[in-house]
Amino acid sequence: MVLCSNDTVRQLVHSTPIVAQSFIEEDGSVTLSMSDLDLVVNAENMQEAKQALIDDLTEYAEEYYQNFELYSRAPNRREHLSLVMKVLTSASKKELEDAVQCQNGKI
């Protein structure tokens, strides 16, 4: 077991990207998708979409942490740990929203 402070964990996961595919829908709304996490949100604009994505990502991170024994061993979730730790140790929701990197999605 390794014990370290939130600041140390934050430094370790600082470079972990939060990457989402972005799609502008026909009605002008914005869809953001993190397919590796099965997260998809839609909102009226990019800012609201980022906020919704971070809300869903935070919920997932908390669920991962609560079920750590299971999730950390699951082949489809094991690789999410650094992102989960980034979310859980972030200083603010705004910090996470600013960290979201949107790439043009392709259908």
Where are these regions (language model features)?
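Short, charged, surface-exposed hinge/linker loops at domain edges
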Residues: M1-V19, F23, Q51-I107
